[in-house]
Regions:
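Rhodanese-like catalytic fold shared by cysteine-dependent sulfurtransferases
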Residues: 1-24, 28-81, 85-123
Length: 123
């Protein structure tokens, strides 16, 4: 055992859509991206994935394990899906969470993909 986390897993939009409400979702975008007030011109819809908790990646990387558990309501070993706008910030979050013992998965398509799928719900 080297202490280096295994490469992080990914989740496809289809699986995430089916599992909404079952698996915790973490949005690591800024608050204004999360609430839709940032108004990203490349996204046809603004907001976030239903039920997602928002912890900006810049804050997440500064939190300790206890603070993350409190903010997310999770314990090590629990599954969680992270997303952002295009999958890069959520990749960092996924690695960080996996390093702390969570079963974290990255939704690579992130909001850029989700916002384009009219059949998918948003808040």
């Amino acid at each position: 055992m080297t202490g280096i986390p295994e490469p992080f897993g990914e989740i496809a939009v289809e699986e995430l859509a089916i599992r909404l409400g079952e698996v915790p979702v973490l949005d690591v975008r800024t608050r204004s991206e999360f609430d839709g007030s940032a108004g990203q011109p490349c996204d046809p819809r603004q907001g976030h994935i239903p039920g997602a908790r928002n912890v900006d990646i810049s804050r997440l990387v500064e939190l300790g394990r206890d603070d993350i558990e409190a903010a997310l309501g999770l314990e090590p070993g629990d599954e969680i899906v992270a997303y952002c706008h295009s999958g890069s910030r959520s990749a960092i979050a996924t690695q960080l969470l996996r390093g702390l013992g969570y079963e974290a998965r990255n939704y690579v398509g992130s909001w850029h993909e989700w916002s384009r799928r009219e059949e998918l719900p948003i808040e």
